[in-house]
Curated annotation (Swiss-Prot):
Its EC number is 7.3.2.5. SMART domains: AAA (SM00382). Residues 1-232 form the ABC transporter domain. It comes from Methylococcus capsulatus (strain ATCC 33009 / NCIMB 11132 / Bath). This is Molybdenum import ATP-binding protein ModC. Belongs to the ABC transporter superfamily. Molybdate importer (TC 3.A.1.8) family. GO terms for cellular component: plasma membrane. Part of the ABC transporter complex ModABC involved in molybdenum import. Responsible for energy coupling to the transport system. The keyword Transport applies. ATP binds at residues 33-40. It is a peripheral membrane protein.
Amino acid sequence: MEDIHARFHIDWPGFRLDVDLTLPGRGVTALFGHSGSGKTTLLRCIAGIERVSAGRLTFNGEVWQDEKIWVPTHKRPLGYVFQEASLFPHLTVLGNLRFGMKRASGPVRVSLDQAVELLGIGHLLDRKPDRLSGGERQRVAIARALAVSPRVLLMDEPLAALDLKRKQEILPYLERLHDELDIPVLYVSHSPDEVARLADHLVAMEEGRVIAAGPLKETLARLDLPIRLGEDAGAVLDAVVGERDESWHLARLDFPGGSLWTRDRGIPVGRKIRVRVLARDVSLARQRQEETSVLNLLRGRVDAIEDEDHPGLALVRVRVGESPLLARLTKRSASALGIVRGQEVWVQVKSVALME
């Protein structure tokens, strides 16, 4: 099975990195954590930008670094996208892409035309970087990284320097990379929204350590992680648009375990879509509530309960069929309902965020 194995130890003044993990060789793996958690340092170690004496790195069994072997960055078949688009100002967009092609080695995994089409930059090829918007520059930087025909693409918070409008413009292009290219992506981010929208796998980091790693949906639904805290705690579901009710302007999203109704956004029936359900938008009941404004009522079973940092709050994980959902309750409510593990409950979902 294709995979990336990374083991690094750094002990710098004021910072320590100690990781030993295996990353999947397919899909998008998000390295997630707060600033200073070590995610960018780990990415730079994988790229060979940081040379760490105590380290070992293999890609699909091929050694890139150990006690005796060191493959320098320029000889590693990888593409790297920084926070700021580092384009050559004296070259046109096409010139920047051709520069990337010069670094390509081995079989062509992504052609120049394919990179241009995937990132939607065909109309920009004759422009210099100073005539591009921030989002356009970053799309060109990603296309140049792909022009290297990399075996793995490393992305260090590529949207961090962009405003919200530019982020929304570029996210669909990142989704296309995920859907149309068979190249593993390691994606550094501290944004739960980006992670929920793009990632297949999650590596959560804190103070230079990996505190959790695994498939995105199951890892986000864990209750023993600091990432569960705050307003961003929630679950991710992969759904399919099952019906559009034009009379009420609603759409039904079917997922393993049930269905959710949400505002109709014109997405065609049959389209696969990822949705995010925040814990603050979920409540629980012992009996089905008939007279309520909440449209989404699902049958579930309590799977786990965990205290929050706030003494008055608890986080409850409920399984709806195969799918986990999180609910944030006051402890008073949990006590009044007699919430215990294994109990059957009605899950009331007030709001659903479409990751599109």
